[in-house]
Regions:
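Secondary-structure transition/capping residues
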Residues: 49, 70-73, 150, 154, ...
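Alpha-helix boundary/capping detector
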Residues: 88, 153-154, 165, 169, ...
Length: 185
């Protein structure tokens, strides 16, 4: 198959291939500049497994835990849909010609029950992106800003969800982002 991976109808390609398999996998050494769109597309299509060679820094962002410097929207977005693992790094010298960056192999196992239903993923990702775009603000102020709700309403929701009002987006686990997003709708 040749073509633009971002424009390919993956399901149709699989159904009309000689393999016609139900439990298909995505494996690849992908162009680093389109890593995020490829991962988002692959997760939307729900293969049994995704294994990709990506830039090492991107791998770190995908698998990051709350509180780390690399934790952000990419981490949350991937982790609400899949179990993510960084398997190993690949040095630049492993390639000819060697790239200017190190690489890593990541594995994403799509969750049988993702924390966000597939049709809602774009709205959830937009919510998370808005939270991280105001990274230095407290969640209380972020939620007031993006929902236009009064402080007392936001405070009550944070208390009900067990989120400290002074917490910042980079400290929140993916499950809490899902809860806040559901409240904000």
């Amino acid at each position: 198959m040749t073509g633009d991976v971002l424009r390919l109808d993956w399901r149709s390609a699989i159904l009309h291939s000689a393999f016609n398999i139900l439990h298909w996998k995505v494996l690849g050494n992908i162009p680093y500049y389109i890593t995020t769109p490829i991962i988002e597309l692959a997760l939307r299509e729900r293969p049994a497994l995704i294994v990709l060679l990506v830039q090492d820094e991107v791998a770190d962002r995908i698998v990051s835990a709350p509180g780390s410097k690399t934790y952000g929207g990419l981490s949350v977005g991937a982790q609400v849909e899949a179990q993510v693992e960084k398997l190993f790094t690949v040095k630049a010298g492993s390639f000819t010609p060697p790239p200017k960056v190190h690489s890593a192999v990541i594995r994403l196992r799509p969750l049988l029950r993702p924390l966000v239903a597939p049709p809602d993923v774009p709205a959830f990702r937009a919510f998370v992106a808005a939270c991280f775009s105001l990274r230095r603000k407290t969640l209380r102020n972020v939620l007031r800003s993006i929902t236009s709700r009064p402080a007392e309403v936001v405070d009550a929701a944070l208390a009900e969800l067990g989120v400290e009002p002074r917490a910042r987006a980079e400290t929140l686990v993916p499950e809490r982002f899902v809860a806040l997003w559901r409240w904000s709708r």
